[in-house]
Amino acid sequence: MGQPVRVAEKISPSSPGTIRFETNRPLTGMGHCYYHGAEDALSDEDPADVLASRLFARGGIDYLHVHGNVATVDLSKGYTSEGIVDIIAGLFAHYEI
């Protein structure tokens, strides 16, 4: 159970490999969060840090920026965004039935 998160994936027309994921839930407060790797995610409780840990564990990500309800991902060359929507959508799920 938990709050279901709806996610809209928007590919940048001007920057190939950059994808915005807009959610119906806030991921941060007023601040911006920048991640170059999983080591930048310091908290096990902060939603943005948890998301960063999960996305970098998935692989294929060079950079992540999270602000408000938007996560912007720069994909590594040769990788697709497959599976990222599911990771974000499951962020606030504590268990599945």
Regions found by a protein language model. Give the residues of each.
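Conserved short beta-strand edge segments in small beta-sheet-based binding/regulatory domains
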Residues: 94-97
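Short, surface-exposed beta-strand-loop junctions and turns on beta-sheet-rich folds
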Residues: 27-28, 79-81
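Short, charged/polar N-terminal "headpieces" of proteins
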Residues: 1-17
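Charge-rich, low-aromatic oligomerization/scaffolding segments with amphipathic character
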Residues: 80-92
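Short acidic amphipathic segments
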Residues: 55-70
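Short beta-strand-to-loop capping motifs
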Residues: 23-25, 73-77
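Short amphipathic alpha-helix segments
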Residues: 43-58
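Short glycine-/aliphatic-rich beta-strand segments at the starts of folded cytosolic domains
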Residues: 13-41
